[in-house]
């Protein structure tokens, strides 16, 4: 739980976002926090021997997926929004592990690594264009100034939300189907939490997208 930054051991990850954004794209999206998910998947025969361990994973993962998504909804720092989004998506993977759907967890781990790295790099481009201002309240209307960044951020956002025909749709669907048929204690509550979490994901993702790329310009132009 601590390695994958799950509730209540999640407080360290947002503060680790202070480094360069390309490093965050590599470490946070594809390697560091996802190592805990991969470790549990590799040790699946051990976890299958304990019904209690599986139940704890389902419940903790569901809480993380929903609660940390709600936290992302109220953030104003662009990198922290993406950081809490990562924690929320890791919650989906933990739920899949608790439901013994190890292939679904690793599938979402792989798809998430690609579209979250894409989002991190888009965020880095925005921060550079804003002269290192990371407050989304100071942005707006950047779509016409950064068309390539706009396009990549849109693709990453659609995949994160789980729009059909994007990778996130298929991996999230496999997790939801796994928890729906699971008999582990807490599976029903987890299914409800994950279902609500899907709408929360859409809200904070497009809140970020429209705050940054659409609307009126809230920044001062610099030469």
Annotate the PLM regions.
Residues 1-223:
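Hydrophobic transmembrane alpha-helices and their helix-loop junctions in integral membrane proteins
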């Amino acid at each position: 739980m601590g390695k994958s930054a799950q509730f209540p051991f999640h407080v360290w990850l947002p503060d680790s976002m202070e480094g360069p954004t390309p490093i965050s794209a590599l470490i946070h999206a594809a390697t560091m926090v996802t190592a805990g998910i991969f470790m549990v998947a590799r040790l699946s025969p051990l976890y299958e021997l304990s019904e209690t361990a599986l139940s704890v994973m389902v419940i903790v993962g569901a809480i993380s997926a929903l609660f940390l998504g709600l936290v992302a909804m109220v953030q104003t720092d662009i990198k922290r929004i993406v950081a809490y989004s990562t924690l929320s998506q890791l919650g989906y993977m933990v739920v899949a592990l608790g439901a013994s759907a190890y292939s679904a967890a690793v599938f979402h781990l792989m798809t998430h690594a690609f579209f979250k790295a894409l989002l991190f790099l888009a965020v880095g481009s925005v921060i550079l264009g804003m002269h290192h201002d990371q407050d989304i309240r100071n942005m707006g209307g950047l779509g016409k100034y950064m068309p390539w960044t706009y396009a990549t951020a849109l693709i990453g956002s659609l995949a994160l939300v789980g729009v059909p025909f994007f990778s996130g749709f298929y991996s999230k669907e496999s997790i939801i189907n796994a928890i729906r048929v699971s008999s582990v204690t807490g599976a029903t509550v987890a299914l409800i939490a994950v279902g609500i979490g899907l709408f929360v994901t859409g809200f904070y993702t497009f809140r970020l997208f429209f705050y940054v790329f659409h609307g009126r310009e809230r920044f001062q132009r610099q030469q």
